[in-house]
């Protein structure tokens, strides 16, 4: 669905009074120190967009890392109330009271499903304006679109949402999971759930993939013979040895296809690989392994491991996701 500018109305008329007060306060604070982005550009970014952004993009791996960190901070963390996976763990993304502002914007969006106030409110935050003023307009569009991808996680029509997950000890028993909010059937494509992919050169891997365990997801493509950075909402999909869904990559994005019928409350999972969690996934803590007494739940030293059919792309993870309270 596309949204066109609103017949010459000032964008401020589209927002609740409290949102206007927050934006006005932030603008007053930053005017002396920032080269202000023209209001017309903010209006363009906030009013003329698609609820499901185009699949292709021109983000570099570094840009995708920063865009993803910012978007998850603004949207996901504001709802879950803890910091989810970040590529740049030491970077601070929000200033002062902006965490509260983000929480209020997300509370309002989840209630009224109005895109423009949420987008406009985020883009007018001091920290966001400081970040995007350095970007060319086409990159501002891509940053805005990445925020929209995460807003879809909380849209009533998405058919899924995100919840806290306490299953995995390697995450300190505080992570996230995606769950269905409606029935899905084998072969369905989850339209509002996607991953964003960037090819990684050897130099990119040396620059981005930190040995101390930066949080990121990587897929190795046998077809392309290179590693690809995988972020976006799809990065929150957990592994299961009997998955409900699968990754389907195409170009610079990947969509999610349903493998088994699901009802509301079922977790959206994919298969990462037969040795992702050690030999024969001996350290796997997925629900299927718990039910079948395999992986981390096995009581024997040796076990047979019935593997799902081989994937053309093997998902490899170089670091563990850490979580800290906001």
Curated annotation (Swiss-Prot):
Note the InterPro entries from the entry.
Answer: Hist-Lys_N-MTase_N, SET_dom, SET_dom_sf, Suv4-20/Set9, Suv4-20_animal
Which transformation does this protein catalyse, written as a reaction?
Answer: N(6)-methyl-L-lysyl(20)-[histone H4] + S-adenosyl-L-methionine = N(6),N(6)-dimethyl-L-lysyl(20)-[histone H4] + S-adenosyl-L-homocysteine + H(+); N(6),N(6)-dimethyl-L-lysyl(20)-[histone H4] + S-adenosyl-L-methionine = N(6),N(6),N(6)-trimethyl-L-lysyl(20)-[histone H4] + S-adenosyl-L-homocysteine + H(+)
Record GO biological process: methylation
Identify the keywords attached in UniProt to this record, alphabetized: Chromatin regulator, Chromosome, Methyltransferase, Nucleus, Repressor, S-adenosyl-L-methionine, Transcription, Transcription regulation, Transferase
Tell me the segments the record calls region Disordered. 294-313
Localisation: Nucleus; Chromosome
One Gene Ontology cellular component annotation held by this UniProt entry: chromosome
Q: Which GO terms describe its molecular function?
A: histone H4K20me methyltransferase activity
EC number(s) recorded for this UniProt protein: 2.1.1.362
Main localization is: nucleus
Residue limits of the SET domain? 163-273
- Pfam families (alphabetical): SET
Q: Which family does it belong to?
A: Belongs to the class V-like SAM-binding methyltransferase superfamily. Histone-lysine methyltransferase family. Suvar4-20 subfamily.
So what does this one do? Answer: Histone methyltransferase that specifically di- and trimethylates 'Lys-20' of histone H4 (H4K20me2/me3). H4 'Lys-20' trimethylation represents a specific tag for epigenetic transcriptional repression. Contributes to dosage compensation of X chromosome-relative to autosome-linked gene expression, possibly by converting H4K20me1 to H4K20m2/me3 on autosomes. Involved in the regulation of growth and body fat metabolism downstream of the TOR complex 2 pathway.
Q: What is this protein called?
A: Histone-lysine N-methyltransferase Suv4-20
Q: Provide the species name.
A: Caenorhabditis briggsae
Q: What is the lineage of its organism?
A: Eukaryota, Metazoa, Ecdysozoa, Nematoda, Chromadorea
Give the encoding gene's name. set-4
